């Protein structure tokens, strides 16, 4: 398998041979604009040549605009009210990379003249592909630090799985290296009162999602069941495919569940006034900022990995020099299955592990835990899993352009369970991750994914249903998955937002 890079926009394609009629999905350049990359890790010259050509063209446009005011505005529209991302106008060179990414990679299309307002999933892929750093997450880290400094609130952080294998990149560590112990130490140094693992929330999601799936399977509910932990995908479904909303799992995302449990259960156990609690989710994902504002009221702040890197440097905390600390108890650690939520296919693997236990009353053996067909970076992955008298067909989709392939001609209907992630590689490729050379993105995603699988392999507890703290939560408070208490705190509903495409008011 060879890698080719587009000299105009930096898009990378992996194929045995580039066909003569190949067209770049980003900038629509032909085959002649691609060059073969001979080294595994792209060198600086590769990146410089791409950026130089993009910048040179953009500067020519800027210069011509002084004379001609009718020059095309190539950048993607970002509303001033966008909760996830913002543009720094002074850095923008109108190269069009953001718009190409949004249209060709994220697969968003709409008529702005009709819509009146831009439609954004908040995924932040434009951030990763901007050559000048003109688009950034909407920062909240200064607000969080200000709250901590008042000493009036109980501030609680949760570390998402994908963050622990990326944070070291800004501190001289290798992509994929597990920094979770050092992150706990760093967050306590900053002043957080409690630090939890979002993998606990992922385990909770698994318990509820598997119970929901089993109920649909036995009661002939709407099938297939789609996952709902990626907020960018959820919004895409609401806007572009409202016909699928009955098929979406009603489960909140892991941080949505965990924040609800913190304010309802943890507060009582620790005798803390819920109004005094401030929850801060540390995520690889800018779209989680949108989720916090539009979908889940219990998430107070979402701080991306890239933001946390800035905060640590401002506080002169060198992550690579810190000792490891443990998560706080009660809602602390998660299983290995919860950790691999950060990879494309990880949710499905975790679901299979627990569904197998429910349907057969036995755990999968250690050598049965890895589902190779569901791993890797193919746009659509599928497998058939046999349990008792069922042959369950599952599919894993990364990037929404691939989802459209699955939806064509009702092809998706042959599956029982479909996982969808907006970003390539899943959460490890999120728009809030530390920046790197555009041409090295794929290599770094692979290293991060490997890091999460390594953590899972080393965990003593690898099944969500074997998480002891989770068992206590159900015993003492929730009773069982899909209980009245669970539905109240852990489940949600969706609404048809296709009116946005028509420029209509709700």
Question: How should these model regions be labeled?
Answer:
Residues 1-13, 64-84, 93-111, 254-260, ...:
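Short, charged low-complexity linear segments at domain edges
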Residues 137-506:
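Iron-sulfur-associated redox domains of electron-transfer enzymes in respiratory
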Residues 8, 21, 25-37, 69, ...:
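Iron-sulfur cluster-binding cysteine motifs and their immediate structural context
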Residues 49-55, 101, 105-111, 423:
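Intrinsically disordered, low-complexity polar segments enriched in Ser/Thr/Pro and acidic
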Residues 15, 80, 90, 118, ...:
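Residues that cap or flank secondary-structure elements
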Residues 26-58, 115-129, 143-159, 308, ...:
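Short microdomains enriched in Cys/His and/or Lys/Arg
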Residues 9, 44, 48-76, 155-156, ...:
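Non-ligating segments of multi-cofactor redox enzymes
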């Amino acid at each position: 398998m060879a890698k080719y890079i587009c000299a105009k926009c930096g898009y990378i394609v992996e194929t045995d041979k580039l066909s003569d009629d190949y067209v770049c999905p980003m900038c629509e350049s032909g085959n002649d604009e691609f060059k073969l990359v001979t080294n595994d890790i792209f060198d600086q010259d590769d990146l410089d040549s791409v950026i130089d050509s993009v910048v040179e063209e953009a500067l020519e446009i800027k210069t011509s605009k002084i004379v001609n005011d009718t020059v095309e505005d190539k950048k993607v529209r970002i509303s001033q009210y966008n909760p996830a991302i913002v543009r720094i106008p002074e850095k923008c060179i109108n190269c069009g990379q953001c718009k190409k990414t949004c249209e060709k990679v994220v697969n968003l299309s709409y008529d702005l003249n009709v819509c009146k307002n831009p439609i954004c999933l908040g995924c932040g892929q434009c951030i990763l592909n901007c050559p000048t750093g003109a688009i950034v997450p909407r920062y909240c880290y200064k607000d969080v630090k200000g709250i901590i400094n008042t000493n009036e609130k109980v501030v609680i952080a949760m570390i998402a799985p994908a963050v622990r294998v990326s944070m070291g990149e800004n501190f001289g560590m290798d992509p994929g290296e597990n920094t979770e112990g050092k992150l706990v130490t760093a967050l306590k140094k900053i002043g957080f009162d409690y630090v939890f693992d979002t993998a606990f929330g992922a385990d909770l999601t698994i318990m509820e999602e598997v119970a929901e799936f089993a109920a649909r399977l036995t009661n002939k509910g709407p099938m297939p069941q789609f996952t709902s932990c990626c907020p960018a995908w959820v919004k895409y479904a609401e806007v572009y495919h409202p016909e699928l909303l009955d098929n979406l799992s009603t489960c909140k995302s892991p941080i949505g569940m965990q924040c609800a449990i913190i304010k309802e259960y943890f507060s009582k156990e620790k005798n803390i006034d819920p109004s005094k609690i401030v929850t801060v989710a540390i995520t690889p994902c800018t779209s989680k900022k949108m989720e916090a504002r539009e979908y889940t009221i219990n998430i107070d702040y979402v701080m991306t990995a890239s933001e946390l890197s800035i905060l640590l440097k401002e506080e002169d905390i060198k992550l690579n020099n810190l000792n490891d600390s443990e998560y706080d108890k009660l809602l602390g650690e998660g299983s290995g299955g919860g950790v691999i939520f950060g990879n494309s296919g990880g949710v499905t693997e975790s679901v299979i592990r627990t569904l197998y236990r429910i349907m057969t009353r036995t755990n999968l053996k250690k050598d049965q835990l890895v589902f190779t067909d569901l791993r890797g970076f193919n746009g659509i992955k599928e497998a058939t899993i046999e349990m008792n008298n069922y042959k369950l067909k599952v599919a894993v989709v990364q990037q929404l352009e691939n989802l459209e392939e699955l939806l064509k001609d009702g092809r998706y209907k042959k599956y029982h369970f479909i996982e969808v992630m907006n970003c390539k590689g899943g959460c490890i490729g999120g728009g809030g991750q530390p920046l790197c050379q555009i041409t090295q993105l794929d290599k770094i995603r692979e290293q991060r994914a490997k890091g999460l699988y390594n953590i899972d392999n080393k965990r003593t507890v690898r099944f969500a249903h074997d998480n002891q703290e989770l068992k206590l939560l159900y015993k003492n408070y929730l009773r069982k998955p899909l209980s009245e208490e669970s539905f109240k705190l852990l489940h949600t509903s969706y609404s048809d937002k296709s009116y946005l495409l028509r420029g209509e008011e709700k």
